[in-house]
Amino acid sequence: MSVSLSKGQGVSLKKNEYDLSSVTIGLGWDINEEKKGFLGGIFGKKEEEYDLDVIAFLCNSAGKVTDLGNVENGKPTLVNGDIIFFNSLRHKSGNIWLTGDNRTGAGDGDDEQIIVRLNSLDAQYEKIVFIVQIYNGEKLQQHFGKVQNAFIRAVDARNIEMARFDLSGGPAFASQRSMVFAELIREATGWKLRAIGEPSESDSFVSHLRNYM
């Protein structure tokens, strides 16, 4: 039975209870529809499309990201390192990857997914942090206040939902454009999924990355 988490809560995903050979971390969301005028009242046309991205940081025992990817002109590019995002979809180990980029949130179920082979993940990785951002949110004046029915969930290799964290928007999130959504923490008997839900006004995951360096 899936465990529904509240902010700050965690649940153990034990190897003897679930198949952790391949775990799907799914993210989903809806955008509030705004009706304008007579035609808007008929069709309920969305005011705009939101592009939400999910990002994963692979951290060591100290909770830090140590590999920032390829270096160009003396600066790390974050590509082919320990960060999984839209410009670096697959980790070099082959044990964690992003399935694609949904730019609208349309449709039922997961809008974006990160697949993790937890049983095969190198021992040096003790934590995986999941960030959600609104791409170009500042430029487009978009924010989580209009994001509804947002969730992150963990599903094992047998398609059994193990845990879920639901987080809707609202006035309190009207200036927030990114969020530390959840994290996976390695335990002796498996992994723990912890719900965080800490928002930020920045629309870039890089602002969160600084806390893990």
UniProtKB/Swiss-Prot annotation:
What are the recorded Gene Ontology BP terms? response to tellurium ion
Its domain of life reads: Bacteria
InterPro entries cross-referenced by the UniProt entry:
Stress/Tellurium_Resist, TerD
List the transmembrane segments. Answer: none
Keywords, alphabetical: Plasmid, Tellurium resistance
Q: Does the keyword Ribosomal protein apply?
A: no
Report the sequence similarity comment from the record: Belongs to the CAPAB/TerDEXZ family.
Q: What does this protein do?
A: Not known; seems to contribute to the tellurium resistance (Ter) mechanism. Also involved in phage inhibition (Phi) and colicin resistance (PacB).
Protein name according to UniProt:
Tellurium resistance protein TerX
